[in-house]
Amino acid sequence: MFEVRAALEGLAAAIVSARPDLVALVAKLQIALDALESARGSINHMVEVDLAFHRLLCELTGNITLVRTWEALAGSIRMSIMFAGTDKAITNMSVPRHQQVIDAIATGDPAVARDAVDQHMREAAQNLLSDQSSEDDASEPIIA
């Protein structure tokens, strides 16, 4: 699933980075990221805000097919986050990881933007697939 997300969201980042209204679009992404930072404390709320950030990235392309394709994956994305366990989910939803994506988009270079999303997804997949979990987490799924 992360390969598909990397392709889809990488395309979205590349499109957004080449838009003439880039500054305004980056500001919208930053607001969405600020919401993620404010969501700390409620893991379920964090998941929804994280998904909203990624959906927004797709929406900012103005490409309805891209958005609908992302929406078709949203349930599977949510499930993978919820079953990863709290510690892994929080790591993947970290503000610095998302800020790197925004910063890459803000360069206006589609290749840089796409690469940042690829890295974000690669790290998220590695984290979810790792056997390392804290004693507190014990890989317990997040119950909504």
Region roles according to the model:
Residues 1:
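A hydrophobic alpha-helix adjacent to the NAD(P)-binding/active-site core of NAD(P)-dependent oxidoreductases
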Residues 4-83, 95-100, 112-122:
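Conserved amphipathic alpha-helical segments that form helical-bundle/coiled-coil interaction surfaces
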Residues 89-90:
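Hinge/beta->alpha junction and helix N-cap segments in small-molecule ligand-binding domains
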Residues 110-144:
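C-terminal effector-binding regulatory domain of bacterial HTH transcription factors
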Residues 86:
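Nucleotide-sugar donor phosphate/pyrophosphate-binding loop at the beta->alpha transition
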